Each structure stands twice: as C-alpha cells, then as structure tokens.
Amino acid sequence: MTQPLRVGLAGLGTVGGGVIKILDTNAALIERRANRPIEVVAISARDRSRERGIDLSRFAWVDDATQLAARDDVDVVVELIGGADGPALTLARETLDAGKSFVTANKAMLAHHGLELAGLAEIKGAALKYEAAVAGGIPVIKGLREGAAANVIERIYGILNGTCNYILS
C-alpha cells in the first residue's frame, strides 16, 4: 500500500471541520484519484473545548499551530486560521522553511506576503497551494497555470471572490 499523505490542519472552524468531514466521507474516492490515502494526523485550534460536531479524539492535538510544521508525522500543513500576519504567517513560513507543502485559503496573508511565501517555497522545494483562496475555490489557478502554459498572461481583472459573489447576489 502507498504511504498516506499526512496532513496537519490548523483551524477547526466551519471550513476546517468541513475538510475533515469531506476527507472522511470521500476517503475511497480521494484515495483513487490521488493514488494514495490522505489522512489528517494532527490538528490545532484556538479553543480545544469547543463542540464541533465531529470526533477529534483520533488526531494528535497541538496547542500552538506552528508545532505542526515541526512534526515528523506531518507531510503537508493546511492553514485555515486567517489573518494576514500573526500565527498564520508564522505557520506558513515555518512550514515552507521545513521543506513541507503548505495549503491555505487565506486571501489576506497571500495579498500581503504571497511573493515572499512563493519565493520561500521555491527555495525550499516545497509547494505553496492557494487555489481555495481564489475565485471562491473554483480551480482557476491550476487551469491557467497548466492549460495556458503556452500563453503569457500578464493579469486578470474581475470579481472572482466567493464572498463578493455572495454579497452581490
């Protein structure tokens, strides 16, 4: 059997809890498509005692999200904390500096520190994935990067944000 991709998840609000539920509910399908299982192994959130409607007892709990980056049993860190600076940025830097892949939906952090983080990821040979932060999660980044590889795209203008779409509708 192929080794699982081991995930450290920071942030257990609506989105973080949803990630765990989706990975549980669709485990077999995800494993077939990814050619390996994806398992959350460690988690972190501000309030350990908050009821979230899911069983978290099977995961290692860390009180400081930045500890996820240093864990030997974590291959990729998913950040769903939010905020341009503070714990989210520290976690991003430490994860990428450790040569581990980093996934985020954090628009604010990417707007303020995206170039820095992309540079660090490139230097360390890690992946920085932020598809969920763009266009309400519509997979446009991968499509543009891979599907338009022979074209030079200088910029794209428009409202491609799920929050704006929700407000405007």
Features from the language model and the residues they span:
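General beta-strand structural signal in soluble alpha/beta enzymes
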Residues: 61-63, 70, 78-79, 103-105, ...
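Charged, alpha-helix-enriched surfaces in structured cytosolic catalytic cores
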Residues: 14, 135, 139, 151, ...
